[in-house]
Regions:
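A cross-kingdom marker of C-terminal helix-rich interaction/assembly modules
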Residues: 1-33, 37-39, 49-52, 58-188
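Cytochrome P450 catalytic-core helices
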Residues: 42, 46
Length: 188
């Protein structure tokens, strides 16, 4: 394993440790909107780890990790020979093929990172802004991974007991894929 890989993994793990402490403190104090923001931050690390793990070009993987270590944005060379920024959306679309729930966590979490009507969740159900298909898909994922009752309406109050479970699912999957990076393996 290279020095760059070591440093990248250290950065990801440091962020994850802080996220874990933060989400538990926030949850214990009933600060649910910020819990969802922290969940979204953990997902941000996860999509990057997945993206790297799917690259078969180890040199490209190292280059992207080096960009992170140096505090720079990720980019890729286009067919025209120009550098193009790799966006969160690019990585979410890529990762969503492997983990279908990622897009839902990302999209919903963004509503709590950026100022939006989701911050009025005490008065308005932010899940109501989603399509019936999206709500049904979220309930299906919550049921599949965490035994969320199909008959439960999707509200913040009903989701709250599952929030830490969703966080742990994202975090543990990320750490598993981080081990693959450490060993220079491609993700399955």
């Amino acid at each position: 394993m290279s020095e760059i890989t070591d440093k990248f993994i250290e950065i990801v793990k440091s962020r994850s440790i802080e996220n874990r402490k933060s989400i538990h403190l926030l949850f214990d104090n009933g600060i649910i909107g910020n819990c969802i923001s922290v969940l979204r931050q953990e997902l941000d690390s996860f999509i990057r780890v997945i993206y790297l793990g799917k690259l078969d070009d180890i040199n490209e993987r190292q280059r992207l990790m080096r960009l992170t270590v140096n505090g720079q944005e990720w980019n890729e060379l286009t067919i025209n020979g120009k550098l193009r920024k790799i966006t969160d959306r690019d990585m979410v679309n890529f990762a969503n093929v492997l983990f279908g729930y990622i897009n839902y966590v990302y999209k919903f979490g963004c509503g709590f990172i950026h100022l939006s009507n989701n911050h009025d969740f005490q008065n308005e159900n932010p899940f109501e802004t989603l399509s019936e298909y999206d709500k049904s898909s979220i309930i299906t994922y919550l049921n599949q991974y965490h035994s969320y009752p199909f008959e439960n309406e999707l509200t913040i109050e009903n989701f709250k007991p599952y929030l830490l479970l969703v966080y742990e699912k994202v975090s543990s999957n990320m750490l598993c894929h981080l081990d693959e990076l450490k060993e220079n393996r491609m993700s399955d």
